């Protein structure tokens, strides 16, 4: 049986870049890594609490963190920045305040910026979140996969693969179903493939959603 490596880690340094940009001494490395995780969790939790509803979803593609001597810079790539800016009136300022309460900044400054993704449905995180929202609202999984693939047809995507595992449609025995359109060359290292795993909480249990998107070949 073939061993499945994470497509992002497999291409790190070739077609994939790191999401955190900083250096640290060995005895201080784990503290900064924990801080990064806290910041990302805080942002995702804020989006789920204040923005995500039955009709829309956060649409965060990725979060990049850059550290300098006394500055932490967070860049949030999102497909729908208006949702984040206009939420609850204050939006980004309230989110920044939430992150500051989680961290012990000391003399450091925190800067936060929003960057709009031109084609939201070329990002696997956004597509996986859309699929999860549909499944949680009890939409049939085949219809959901078909709709997600249709959303990518008008974009620059060359191939997409979607896999959903769990008690599909409430079946007693869990199984795995998948759909693919176009090419998804997972063993070609120079192929720019984005990948995401996202869990969906349904009344029958947790469904695991995996999305692979092939964008271009370098």
Swiss-Prot record:
GO terms for cellular component: chloroplast; cytosolic small ribosomal subunit. GO terms for biological process: translation. It holds the Pfam family Ribosomal_S3_C. The keyword Plastid applies. One of its GO terms (molecular function) is structural constituent of ribosome. Part of the 30S ribosomal subunit. This is Small ribosomal subunit protein uS3c. It comes from Anthoceros angustus. The lineage of its organism: Eukaryota, Viridiplantae, Streptophyta, Embryophyta, Anthocerotophyta.
